[in-house]
């Protein structure tokens, strides 16, 4: 689980936009960039080279994702 305070502070390094946390996959999602940044051992890996590209069929913002807006 990622601390809510950390989620409030972090932004996408590519776009500067907000991130959502996918608890099932342990990833920080940037819908604007279409990327998912991994969270390993509770540490967000905020490197574009480490991010996975989102697939079109993946959940959109607000569906089963925790974001800094959901407080």
UniProtKB/Swiss-Prot annotation:
GO terms for cellular component: cytosol. Residues 52-71 are annotated as: Disordered. It comes from the Bacteria. Residues 52-63 have a biased composition (Basic and acidic residues). InterPro entries: Trm112-like. It holds the Pfam family Trm112p. PANTHER family: PROTEIN PREY, MITOCHONDRIAL, ZGC:162634. Belongs to the UPF0434 family. This is UPF0434 protein APH_0052. It comes from Anaplasma phagocytophilum (strain HZ).
């Amino acid at each position: 689980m990622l601390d809510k305070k950390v989620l409030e502070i972090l932004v996408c390094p590519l776009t500067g936009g907000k991130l959502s946390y996918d608890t099932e996959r342990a990833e920080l999602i940037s819908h604007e960039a279409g990327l998912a940044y991994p969270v390993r051992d509770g540490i967000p890996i905020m490197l574009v080279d480490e991010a996975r590209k989102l697939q079109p069929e993946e959940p959109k913002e607000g569906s089963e994702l925790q974001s800094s807006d959901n407080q």
